[in-house]
């Protein structure tokens, strides 16, 4: 009796069960079924697989560079099965590497450019100046007094005599001619400025020169009475303490007076000194 009742009750329970109870359980019950999610649309598992294939392809390519003997067939098959995404990634990496190299080269090229786009001219290295000895300068100056331009034979002779090179002799004579030209231009400018001043300005200059001469003579630095300052033309200079005229002006001296004789001797002494400054022996 009990077995029959149980058999009758079992079909009734089966009727009361929901039809969902007969469905198989999902493979992953924790993950919800979302067929329209972003991951399902983009097929994320395949993307991960392509990334893994790309990494393997890069490793195999590096191994191919270091070991040219060849790769196994499995590795070459893996390289041939890379996805288009892997190829795109490799192409992008090569492109960016090329851009980085070009940017670095352009930056290095801009270092040599100025703000206005003009390339900096390299500074010329100055040659070291030749230090001439006193004997060499004396011999060169002595030769320059009567010969401003040298012939090749004279140049070789001077260079051999003084222990210099031909280039050093040529350079010294060029610089000396330029210095002489500057000195002549300065003297010419001084003469022109003196002419513009007029007689009064020239008289003032002569008076200042006489004052300097008298101060040197009183201080004991006159060099034995031989001064280099020029006297005023037409009126001999009077030493300190000379007698004056009653009106307060300087006393006019006769040509035969002792003061005029002293002035004439001082002029002769100055001329002798100027003649002795340059002594040239050919």
From Swiss-Prot:
Cellular compartments per GO CC: nucleus; transcription regulator complex
Residue stretches of biased makeup (Gly residues): 218-227
Subunit structure: Interacts with SKOR1 which acts as a transcriptional corepressor.
SUPFAM superfamilies with a match to the protein in the record: Homeodomain-like
Protein name: Transcription factor LBX1
Residue stretches of biased makeup (Acidic residues): 269-282
Gene Ontology molecular function: DNA binding; DNA-binding transcription factor activity; DNA-binding transcription factor activity, RNA polymerase II-specific
Task of the protein: Transcription factor required for the development of GABAergic interneurons in the dorsal horn of the spinal cord and migration and further development of hypaxial muscle precursor cells for limb muscles, diaphragm and hypoglossal cord.
Skewed-composition ranges (Basic and acidic residues): 1-20
UniProt DNA-binding residue ranges: 125-184
Lineage: Eukaryota, Metazoa, Chordata, Craniata, Vertebrata
Description of the deletion phenotype: Death at birth. Mice fail to expand their lungs and do not move their abnormally thin limbs.
Domain of life: Eukaryota
Primary localization class, coarse: nucleus
SMART domains: HOX (SM00389)
Record keywords, A-Z: Developmental protein, Differentiation, DNA-binding, Homeobox, Myogenesis, Neurogenesis, Nucleus, Transcription, Transcription regulation
GO terms, biological process: cell population proliferation; glutamatergic neuron differentiation; heart looping; muscle organ development; negative regulation of cell population proliferation; negative regulation of glutamatergic neuron differentiation; neuron fate commitment; neuron fate determination
Region (Disordered): 1-36, 210-282
PANTHER family attached to this UniProt entry: TRANSCRIPTION FACTOR LBX, TRANSCRIPTION FACTOR LBX1
UniProt subcellular location: Nucleus
InterPro entries attached to this UniProt entry: HD, Homeobox_CS, Homeodomain-like_sf, HTH_motif, LBX_TF
């Amino acid at each position: 009796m009990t077995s029959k009742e149980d058999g009758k009750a079992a079909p009734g329970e089966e009727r009361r069960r929901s039809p969902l109870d007969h469905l198989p359980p999902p493979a992953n019950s924790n993950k919800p079924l979302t067929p329209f999610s972003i991951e399902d649309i983009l097929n994320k598992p395949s993307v991960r697989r392509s990334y893994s294939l790309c990494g393997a392809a890069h490793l195999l390519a590096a191994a191919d560079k270091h070991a040219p003997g060849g790769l196994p067939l499995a590795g070459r098959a893996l390289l041939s099965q890379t996805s288009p995404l892997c190829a795109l990634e490799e192409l992008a990496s090569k492109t960016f590497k090329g851009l980085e190299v070009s940017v670095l080269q352009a930056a290095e090229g801009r270092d040599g450019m100025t703000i206005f786009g003009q390339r900096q001219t390299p500074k010329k290295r100055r040659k070291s100046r030749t230090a001439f000895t006193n004997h060499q300068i004396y011999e060169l100056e002595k030769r320059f007094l009567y010969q401003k331009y040298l012939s090749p034979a004279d140049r070789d002779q001077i260079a051999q005599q003084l222990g210099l090179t031909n280039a050093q002799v040529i350079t010294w004579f060029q610089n000396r001619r330029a210095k002489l030209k500057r000195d002549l231009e300065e003297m010419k400018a001084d003469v022109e400025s003196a002419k513009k001043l007029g007689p009064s300005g020239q008289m003032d200059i002569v008076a200042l020169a006489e004052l300097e001469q008298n101060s040197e003579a009183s201080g004991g630095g006159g060099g034995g009475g031989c001064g280099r300052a020029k006297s005023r033309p037409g009126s001999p200079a009077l030493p300190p303490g000379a007698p004056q005229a009653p009106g307060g002006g300087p006393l006019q001296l006769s040509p035969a007076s002792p003061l005029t004789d002293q002035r004439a001797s001082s002029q002769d002494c100055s001329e002798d000194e100027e003649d002795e400054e340059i002594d040239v022996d050919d």
